[in-house]
A protein has these predicted regions:
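Membrane-interface amphipathic helices and adjacent TM-edge segments
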Residues: 46-115, 181-218, 244-248
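Extended low-complexity intrinsically disordered regions
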Residues: 35-38, 42-46, 50-54, 58-59, ...
Length: 302
C-alpha cells in the first residue's frame, strides 16, 4: 500500500516544502506560521486544480434537480418493482447525460491527498520522526517543533495529554463541523429550487448530509493531527466561499437565490414582477440636469 501511495507522498510533501522554502526566510523554518501557511497553500493549489470538477458537480446537481418530476413519476410507476425502478432511473440519467455521483467527485478526488497528508504529518509526530516523500530528516525535525497557537501541528486530541492541544483541536473540529453545516444549509435554503419534500430522494439525502457530515467530522477529528485539521478547516472555508459566490452570481433557476437575483435586476430595469411595478420611472418626469427651453411669447399686434 505504501509503495502505491509513494507518488502522492512525494507530491504532497513537495508542495508543502516548496511553500515552506518561500516562507522560511520571513517567519523562520520552525515557525508554526510557516508550516500552517504551507498547509493552507496546499489547499489553495488543490482547490484551484479541482475547479473543473466543481463546475461539473454544479451542472450535475442542476440537471438532477430538473429531472425530479420525471424521477418521482418513475418511483410512483414502479413502486413495487425496485429493479425496474433502478433500470429506468439509470436510463433517465444516461439519456440526459448526468450522474448522481458527480456531486461526490471533489470529495473523492481529495481523499487520497487527505490520506497522504495524514501519513506525512503522522510520521512527523512519531518519536523519532519518520520522513515521507521529499522531506529530509531536518525538515521533519523542524515540522515537529512547529506549533499552531501553542499546539504542535503533528499532535492529535487522543494522542496528547496537553490541555493546549485538546483546546486547539476542539476549536478546529467545531469550526470544521460548523462550516460543513452552514455550507450544506446554504445550499438547501438558497441554492435549491422549491419542491415538495415528500418522497423527494434528493432533498432527503441533502437533509441527511446536513446533520451527518458534521457528526462524522466531530467523531473522526479527535484522531487527526492538528495539521490535517488545519487542512480540512481551510478546504471547508474555501467550499463555503466558492458556493456562496455561485449561489449569489449564478444561482439555480427556480431557487430563492435566483428569484432574489431576478427581483434585483427588475428593480434596476424598472419592470413589473407578479403584477407589481418595481421602481418604474414616470414618463413625464424631467431628466435631472436637463435644461428646459423657455417658451416664446407671441407679440400683440398694434
Amino acid at each position: 500500500m505504501g509503495s502505491i501511495l509513494n507518488p502522492l507522498y512525494t507530491a504532497v510533501s513537495w508542495v508543502i516544502i516548496s511553500i515552506h522554502g518561500l516562507l522560511a526566510p520571513i517567519f523562520g523554518s520552525t515557525s508554526g506560521v510557516t508550516w500552517s501557511l504551507s498547509i493552507i497553500g496546499l489547499v489553495i493549489l488543490i482547490r484551484i486544480i479541482l475547479i473543473p470538477l466543481f463546475v461539473k458537480q454544479i451542472k450535475s446537481q442542476r440537471a438532477l434537480t430538473a429531472l425530479q418530476p420525471q424521477m418521482k413519476a418513475i418511483q410512483a410507476k414502479y413502486k413495487d418493482d425496485r429493479q425496474k425502478q433502478s433500470e429506468e432511473m439509470m436510463k433517465l440519467y444516461k439519456e440526459h447525460k448526468t450522474n448522481p455521483l458527480a456531486s461526490c467527485f471533489p470529495i473523492l478526488a481529495q481523499a487520497p491527498i487527505f490520506f497522504a497528508l495524514f501519513t506525512v504529518l503522522n510520521g512527523i509526530g512519531k518519536n523519532p520522526p519518520v520522513k515521507h516523500g521529499v522531506l529530509t530528516q531536518a525538515d521533519v525535525v523542524n515540522a515537529a517543533q512547529a506549533k499552531f497557537f501553542g499546539a504542535p501541528i503533528s499532535e492529535t486530541f487522543l494522542g496528547s495529554s496537553s490541555t493546549t492541544v485538546k483546546i486547539v483541536t476542539v476549536i478546529l473540529i467545531a469550526f470544521m463541523s460548523l462550516t460543513t453545516f452552514t455550507t450544506q444549509r446554504q445550499l438547501m435554503v438558497k441554492g435549491m429550487p422549491k419542491m415538495d419534500s415528500s418522497n423527494n430522494m434528493m432533498l432527503q439525502q441533502q437533509k441527511i448530509m446536513l446533520y451527518l457530515f458534521p457528526v462524522i467530522f466531530a467523531i473522526s477529528g479527535v484522531n487527526f493531527p492538528i495539521g490535517v485539521l488545519i487542512y480540512w478547516s481551510t478546504t471547508n472555508l474555501w467550499t463555503w466561499g466558492q458556493q456562496f459566490y455561485v449561489i449569489k452570481r449564478n444561482p439555480t433557476p427556480g431557487s430563492p437565490a435566483y428569484e432574489e437575483l431576478q427581483h434585483k435586476k427588475a428593480r434596476k430595469a424598472g419592470t413589473v414582477i407578479d403584477g407589481a411595478t418595481i421602481d418604474e420611472p414616470r414618463p413625464d418626469e424631467d431628466i435631472k440636469g436637463q435644461r428646459q427651453q423657455p417658451k416664446s411669447k407671441k407679440k400683440k399686434k398694434k
